[in-house]
């Protein structure tokens, strides 16, 4: 008897928690980007939602959720700068590939009218990819990086 199953894909997004009290408009921006990003995941897989991670504790919680669900793959959306402590606890105990999605929302900045929250929320592809890749390498994790400009969400 053939049983149809779907691959289980853990999905989460990260941002530096220290930015949020300084720039509260980033919260709805990041929530909207993350919701749009999740919609790009095909319904041919079972999405396990780890949420938006801004602290080590939230990363650990996402990792617990991924382990409990026995995910086959993890996809991480980098919303803005974040350190690897936002990522590593979520994937450290998993033996699955990790895909870092590092895209900025807008292709061309309007420099004359760009403020810090706009830069951090819509124009900044994460500069911490190197740190995260190095940590994934040290942890022996299979990984890939997708980087560039989002076509659309």
Could you tell me what each predicted segment is?
Residues 1-153:
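Metallocofactor- and cofactor-centric catalytic cores in central/energy metabolism, strongly enriched
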